[in-house]
């Protein structure tokens, strides 16, 4: 931000009230005859004669012998300084006298204040009117070099600090508006729906608003202006995918750093799901140990939880060799012992929930005394999974936080109140997978109806009497519903070393 030059002039004007005056030297002519008189005492007599306050360094221990004839006091002081190697400096109210050996150098750096204006101010105050206090600008920097006696260095440092800090305070208290364009993150909230649920993924603006809730004033005060009471303010520009911040200028550097940290490129992760029904009877014939393993195609898969004979509980396990598992599953599918119902896949960002939903909606009539309406019922397979990429000592892993809901409509059991019935199963789990591994979930037994028809060709299609030549059968088989979930990193050029 460009500092308002008028502000510098105002500050210099305020400090001008403390302007240093030159020595007035009001008094009678001074003359002295002395022998072995301490030089400090001579200087005290000179200052008293002209009614001037003086501070003399205790390191001045020389003695004076001789005569000081009447003359201009400035010449008298300069002659003594040259004769005894002294440095003098007058700050407007006090005359300081030091040995030349106490000359010190100091570099003062400014944040905002211009070095040229600072030196101009010092000269206008007569602060640099003697060799005991000099200030030079260091070319190409925002710093000055001060050469002078200790009291000069102290005074110059104080003035530099007051002026520079006043400008910083004025600059920081100014209200500023900045725009930060995002590359990877989203400024606005992202919202999507599935079934009757609404999911909101907060954008950067919502994160900033949530973070600053405790610092936002809730009401106006007598000392605060309406323009600053609601600070900070955050808004999103969807056209540029940018965050607009309105706050004090002093806070903008912090916002810039925070938004940069939030705007990081996220790895893409592909999640694929296979919904599988395995004939329970065939699995038993192949040798199922519900407590430890399922044998598919002649090879066992270990489970970490068991199934009892009632088939009311589920299991989950990690399959290390997914390709071999799929070969055995395909063999069972060819012999009609297993069925892959669907195999959807989706790509999502790291730490962003993905939803896979296959459902059917049917309606039922609800009738009251004077009103009737239709209510919808939705059921089917719903998978919600949030992947998280982990780097464990150089090994890339994917943590899955998932929830599976598996439902289907069942035939009503009541003839007097024929409302639809829905059978639901739900699994919630977490798992960490290495590359090439898959997660197998499920194990719920459910009935599956298989309709078949046997008929005599042509005769079975005759209207009215055709049913005499055909046989319709409905068989109910017990199947086990399995979910095979695989997550893999999509290579988009991001390194995770």
Curated annotation (Swiss-Prot):
**Signal peptide bounds:** 1-20
> What HAMAP family does the entry give?
Type_III_secretin
Gene Ontology terms: cellular component: cell outer membrane; type II protein secretion system complex; type III protein secretion system complex
- Any Gene Ontology biological process: protein secretion by the type III secretion system
Q: State its location(s).
A: Cell outer membrane
Instruction: Supply the alphabetized keyword list.
Output: Cell outer membrane, Membrane, Protein transport, Signal, Translocation, Transport, Virulence
One Pfam family, short name:
Secretin
Q: Give the species this sequence originates from.
A: Salmonella typhimurium (strain 14028s / SGSC 2262)
Task: Please describe what this protein does.
Answer: Component of the type III secretion system (T3SS), also called injectisome, which is used to inject bacterial effector proteins into eukaryotic host cells. Forms a ring-shaped multimeric structure with an apparent central pore in the outer membrane. Required for secretion of some type III-secreted effectors including the SpvB exotoxin.
**Can you tell which superkingdom this protein's organism belongs to?**
Bacteria
Q: What does the record note on quaternary structure?
A: The core secretion machinery of the T3SS is composed of approximately 20 different proteins, including cytoplasmic components, a base, an export apparatus and a needle. This subunit is part of the base, which anchors the injectisome in the bacterial cell envelope. Forms a stable homooligomeric complex.
According to UniProt, the name of this protein is: SPI-2 type 3 secretion system secretin
Q: What happens when the gene is disrupted?
A: Does not survive in murine macrophages, although it can invade epithelial cells. The SpiC protein is not exported into host macrophage cells.
Family affiliation: Belongs to the bacterial secretin family. T3SS SctC subfamily.
């Amino acid at each position: 931000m460009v500092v308002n030059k008028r502000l510098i002039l105002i500050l210099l004007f305020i400090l001008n009230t403390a302007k240093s005056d030159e020595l007035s030297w009001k008094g009678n002519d001074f003359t002295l005859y002395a022998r072995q008189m301490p030089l400090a005492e001579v200087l005290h007599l000179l200052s008293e004669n002209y009614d001037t306050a003086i501070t003399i360094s205790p390191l001045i221990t020389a003695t004076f012998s001789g005569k000081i004839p009447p003359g201009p006091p400035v010449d008298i002081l300069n002659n003594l300084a040259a004769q005894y190697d002294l440095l003098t400096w007058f700050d407007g109210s006090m005359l300081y006298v030091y040995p030349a050996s106490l000359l010190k150098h100091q570099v003062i750096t400014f944040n905002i204040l211009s070095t040229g204006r600072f030196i101009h101010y010092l000269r206008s105050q007569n602060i640099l009117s003697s060799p005991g206090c000099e200030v030079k600008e260091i070319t190409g920097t925002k710093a000055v070099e001060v050469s002078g006696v200790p009291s000069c260095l102290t005074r110059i440092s104080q003035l530099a600090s007051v002026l520079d800090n006043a400008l910083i305070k004025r600059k920081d208290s100014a209200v500023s508006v900045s725009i930060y364009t995002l590359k990877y993150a989203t400024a606005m909230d992202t919202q999507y729906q599935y079934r009757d649920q609404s999911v909101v993924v907060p954008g950067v603006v919502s994160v900033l608003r949530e973070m600053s809730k405790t610092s936002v004033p809730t009401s106006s005060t007598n000392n605060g202006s309406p323009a600053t009471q609601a600070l900070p303010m955050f808004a999103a520009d969807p056209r540029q995918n940018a965050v607009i911040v309105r706050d004090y200028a002093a806070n903008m550097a912090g916002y810039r750093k925070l938004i940069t940290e939030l705007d990081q490129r996220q790895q893409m992760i592909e999640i694929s799901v296979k919904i599988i029904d395995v004939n329970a009877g065939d699995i038993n014939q192949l040798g199922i140990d519900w407590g430890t393993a399922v044998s598919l195609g002649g090879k066992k898969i270990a489970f970490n939880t068991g199934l009892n004979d009632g088939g009311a509980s589920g299991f989950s396990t990690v399959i290390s060799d997914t390709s071999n598992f799929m070969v055995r599953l395909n063999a069972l599918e060819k012999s009609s012992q297993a069925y892959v119902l669907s195999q959807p896949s989706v790509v999502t960002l790291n730490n962003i929930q993905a939803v896979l939903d296959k459902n059917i909606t049917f309606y039922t009539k609800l009738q009251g005394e004077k009103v009737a309406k239709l209510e919808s019922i939705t059921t089917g397979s719903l998978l919600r999974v949030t992947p998280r990429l982990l780097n464990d000592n150089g090994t890339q892993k994917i943590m899955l936080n998932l929830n599976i809901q598996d439902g289907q409509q069942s035939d009503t059991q009541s003839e007097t109140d024929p409302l639809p019935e829905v059978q639901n199963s739900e699994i919630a789990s977490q798992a960490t997978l290495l590359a090439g591994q898959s997660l197998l979930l499920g194990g719920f037994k459910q009935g599956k109806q298989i309709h078949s028809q046997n008929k005599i060709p042509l005769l079975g299609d005759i209207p009215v009497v055709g049913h005499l030549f055909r046989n319709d059968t409905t068989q109910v088989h017990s199947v086990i519903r399995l979910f095979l979930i695989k997550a893999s990193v999509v290579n988009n050029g991001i390194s995770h070393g």
